[in-house]
Amino acid sequence: MSNGTNIDVAGAINTLTETFGKLFQMQVDVANNSLKALAEVAEPLGKTATDLVASFANVATQVLQNVSSAVAPKK
């Protein structure tokens, strides 16, 4: 009969299920935190890139105006 080593199969399955659930939740949390961090980094980079493009456009416009006024015949 029994020698005192009963295996609690249901308990082991419950423990494994709980462990896998926690691992999955941790992966979801890591992915969520990574996305938040990327968004926090991308926002200032996007603003900086937009400002840089606007500055470049302003410089290009000023250069074209100066070239046009230098080339235009004087009255």
Swiss-Prot record:
GO terms for molecular function: bacteriochlorophyll binding. Keywords: Bacteriochlorophyll, Chlorophyll, Chlorosome, Chromophore, Photosynthesis, Repeat. It comes from the Bacteria. The keyword Amino-acid biosynthesis does not apply. Sequence repeats lie at residues 8-17, 29-39, 40-50, 51-61. It is found in: Chlorosome, Chlorosome envelope. Transmembrane segments: none annotated. The keyword Acetylation does not apply. GO terms for biological process: photosynthesis. Residues 8-61 are annotated as: 4 X approximate repeats. One of its GO terms (cellular component) is chlorosome envelope. Belongs to the CsmB/CsmF family. Component of the photosynthetic apparatus which may bind the chlorosome to the bacteriochlorophyll a protein monolayer. This is Chlorosome envelope protein B. It comes from Prosthecochloris vibrioformis (Chlorobium vibrioforme).
